[in-house]
Regions:
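C-terminal region of N-terminal signal peptides and the immediate post-cleavage residues
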Residues: 33-57, 70, 90, 361, ...
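Secretory targeting and sorting signals
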Residues: 1-45, 706-720
């Protein structure tokens, strides 16, 4: 409603001020109508209706950029600073900014109501502090922001009992169209008032998450150190001064909080401290250069967590809800969660040198249903961090119960307070928004404490990845809370062990109660099917490797990252990452392969077929079986069977050729298939098929062979006949010699002359006869051999010798 300015230096009662303003309106409206010659509707607009319109819109925006101290105690001076901006078309004259304190808000829902409409002019903002505790402006020009700052001693605020008081920062003034003092804009916030220590302070646990998106790929270098490859350089930006993770660390180390850490983040930063590469376009990579930033951040974190409680999430912070709703029906999905949990503690211990707790599971936004709880506890966790807007109170409790409560099966639900946990989720880039968030957080915390005198444990679980400005607002609020008078810090483990309230809800909501907005962001079933396919391919690949850890470790962690909660709302990026992991694994497995063969020709009944295995990996492979199969074993056999196998071992960067013995039964073409197998009978890689053409025994070959045999037979027959003729001539010559001796002739001369006349005809042919050489060498007496000339026909005379035939000698009969 429109309000007139109070008399300077006086603080009249609200009722009196309202009556005075109403009277002025009723008396002045007709006068204004007459003076301005307005129509009846216009005159009504200048009256109460005009005031309602102003209350709905507010022509001047008020921004409270700072409020100090956030939690008041006796003797403090409240300082409120900010800006007022005239968003109207007319200048505002006689403007002044005042503080208004309303009645104490006794319930948390009452605080919600004020926070829901912080700038509505229709609210009851209580009495105006007035007096000199105001900021005045002669004129507010349209579109121009004016700064103000008001300081008021706490004693002037007339605060009563302990509690939460609404504080309205209102600007009043008049315009040319409405020439009376009225409220033109307001901004409401909260003043927590607890000057003395609370009788029963609330034990508050604040989770401080160090979680990021996926940064590392499955790729590593071929060097001994296996240089890692990052998706981009975004992690360096988060670690650099002013970056999100740098702010989370520098702010959190000054607070008493429970560090909740994704081990994948630690592994990624640790990898950045050494040599690393950044993926570029295509298959290119560039060298990373932010080792110093990574080392600084990691060293600071190691110092910050000393003596503090550290909770390790499963590696890469897997999406438990997606797994429960879409992944349990895919073989191996729960095994991935178990592996991510098992490696978490080792990673944290190795990098931070502290022993973390791994028995807490944290579903997205603390939303649970029976399937999520079942999956969350399947890997060993027995405590589930839920949130109050999921595990809602259905009983008759008039206060917020402690966080811990049993939900069956030996599982404890640690229910974070929904209001406190979501206080910093909005856009806090403006200082005014951040200030309002801090004050609302403190107000809700104090109101919670004042609900009952019972000792309670409260958990605050903020969003997983606060922005830098959200982190600063969180840190400011926690600093004020831990320095206040109604709360004490407590570790998460202690909160989980606190005695549950008997009336607190222990029933996990049904699956249908799971928020649809969260369900839309889940990883689909196809994502888990692809992960399972990748795992199957990896299992088939690792068994052949001499050093499987070089491949199993980076791909195992990459598959953990494929299930990360950080993919929510980023379906395209998630799918691209999964595809890249699969493609890189296919590239590696393809480095061990059979070299293609062209058609092979076999000439003869049997031959060997070589098949070459190539290994382009940097490490050796073994436990491989090469099988060569004939598709037509009746025509072509492999080692006397349809197929044969041989074990294969190939060093890194080398090839190995395996030879198979084949035998051909029929001429023609046969298809042969070479295939690698693992020792357990699984196919490895693609088969290589090639044709084998057999040209064993053709008609032409048979004709040639037959002709050769015939020639040998004819040659032997001729030799036989020649020897018979030579023997007959020798007998005749002997008889003639004997007759000559009886007649008194010189037998020696006659005997020598007759053979010399016959020798030219027989000697050369016998010398060239192949049969003559073995007979001479093996059967002639030593003395006779030395007395003969190369052209002499000694075999013919030796055949007639009475001595036994020599070994291997053919003897004519």
């Amino acid at each position: 409603m429109a309000e007139a300015a109070d008399t300077p230096g006086m603080t009249p009662s609200p009722a009196r001020r309202w009556l005075r303003r109403a009277g002025a309106l009723l008396a002045g409206a007709p006068l204004l109508a007459g003076l301005l010659q307005l129509s009846a509707p216009a005159a009504q607009a200048a009256g109460p209706a005009s005031a309602k319109e102003a209350s709905d819109t507010g022509t001047v925006a008020v921004a409270v950029d700072s409020l100090s101290p956030g939690a008041l105690t006796d003797g403090d001076t409240l300082t409120v600073s900010g800006t007022v901006t005239n968003n109207g078309k007319q200048a505002v004259t006689g403007a002044h900014v005042n503080l208004r304190v309303g009645s104490a808000l006794t319930t948390r829902s009452a605080i919600d109501g004020v926070a829901k409409h912080p700038d509505a002019l229709t609210g009851d903002d209580g009495s105006e502090v007035g007096g000199k505790y105001a900021a005045t402006f002669a004129k507010l020009t349209p579109g121009v922001a004016e700064h103000f700052s008001i300081s008021v001693p706490v004693g002037k605020l007339d605060l009563g009992d302990d509690g939460v008081y609404p504080l309205g920062v209102a600007v009043s003034g008049e315009t040319a169209a409405q020439q009376w003092d009225q409220v033109l804009g307001v901004q409401r916030t909260f003043l927590p008032w607890q000057p003395e220590e609370a009788d029963t302070p609330t034990r508050t646990t604040l989770l401080w998450p160090l979680v990021s998106t996926v940064h590392m790929t499955a790729e590593t270098g071929s060097d001994a150190q296996q240089t890692p490859v990052f998706l981009n350089d975004d992690l360096a930006k988060e670690l650099a001064p002013g970056g999100r993770l740098e702010q989370m660390l520098s702010l959190g180390r000054e607070l008493d909080v429970t560090w909740v850490i994704d081990p994948d983040l630690l592994a990624s930063v640790d990898a950045m401290t050494g040599s690393y590469r950044i993926r570029g376009d295509g298959d290119t990579t560039t060298a990373g250069t932010h080792q110093a930033i990574a080392k600084q951040w990691l060293g600071d974190l190691q110092d910050a967590v000393l003596g503090k409680e550290v909770v390790a999430l499963p590696f890469a912070d897997p999406d438990l809800a997606s797994l429960a709703h879409n992944g349990t029906g895919v073989a191996g999905s729960l095994s991935q969660l178990k592996e991510a949990t098992d490696v978490a503690a080792t990673t944290v211990e190795t990098v931070l040198h502290v022993t973390p707790s791994t028995d807490f599971a944290w579903p997205v936004d603390g939303a649970v249903d029976p399937s999520i709880v079942k999956v969350a506890t399947s890997a060993g966790a027995d405590k589930v961090i839920a949130r109050g807007d999921s595990l809602t109170e259905t009983g008759d409790l008039t206060y917020t119960p402690s966080a811990a409560r049993p939900i069956g099966g030996g599982t404890t639900a640690v229910v974070a307070d929904a209001r406190l946990s979501t206080a910093f989720e909005g856009d806090l880039t403006k200082a005014s928004a951040s200030t309002l968030a801090v004050q609302e957080f403190l107000a809700q915390s104090l109101a919670l404490n004042q609900q009952t005198g019972k000792q309670r444990s409260v958990v605050v679980a903020p969003q997983r990845m606060p922005t830098a400005v959200q982190a600063r607002a969180m840190a400011q609020a926690v600093t004020l809370l831990q320095g206040g008078t109604w709360s004490q810090p407590q570790q998460l483990a202690a909160a989980a062990k606190a005695k549950p309230d008997p009336g607190a809800t222990t029933k996990v909501p049904s699956k249908s109660a799971y928020p649809s907005s969260l369900r839309k962001q889940e990883l689909p079933r196809s994502a888990f099917e692809q992960i399972a396919y990748t795992q199957d391919r990896l299992d088939n690949f690792k068994v052949i490797l001499a050093n499987e850890a070089r491949v199993v470790t980076p791909f195992g962690r990459a598959m953990n990252r494929e299930m990360s909660t950080s993919w929510r709302g980023r379906n395209t990026a998630a799918n691209t990452f999964r595809q890249s992991v699969q493609a890189y694994l296919d590239t590696l497995t393809g480095q061990v392969k059979l070299i293609d063969k062209s058609e092979t020709k076999l000439s003869g009944r049997s031959a060997t077929i070589p098949v070459t295995v190539q290994n382009n990996l940097v490490q050796g492979v073994d436990h491989l079986i090469l099988r060569l199969t004939s598709t037509n074993p009746t025509r072509l056999e492999i080692s006397d069977d349809a197929w044969a196998e041989q074990r294969v071992t190939v060093s890194g960067g080398h090839t190995s050729t395996v030879k198979f013995t084949t035998s051909a039964n029929v001429n023609g073409q046969t298809r042969v298939i070479a295939q690698l197998y693992t020792e357990d009978g699984q196919k490895y890689g693609n088969e290589v098929a090639f044709d084998v053409r057999v040209t064993e025994i053709t008609a032409t070959v048979m004709l040639v062979i037959g002709g050769g045999v015939l020639l040998l037979v004819l040659a032997g027959f001729r030799m036989y006949t020649q020897r018979k003729r030579a023997a007959a001539r020798g007998a005749e010559e002997t008889e003639e010699a004997e007759g000559s001796e009886e007649d008194g002739e010189n037998g020696e001369d006659g005997a020598d002359g007759a053979p010399e006349a016959a020798e030219p005809a027989d000697g050369p042919e016998q010398a060239t006869d192949p049969e003559s050489r073995p007979e001479r060498d093996s059967g002639a007496p030593p003395g006779a051999a030395s007395a003969q000339q190369p052209s002499d026909g000694t075999p013919d005379t030796a055949v007639e010798s009475a001595d036994p035939s020599g070994t291997g000698e053919r003897v004519d009969r």
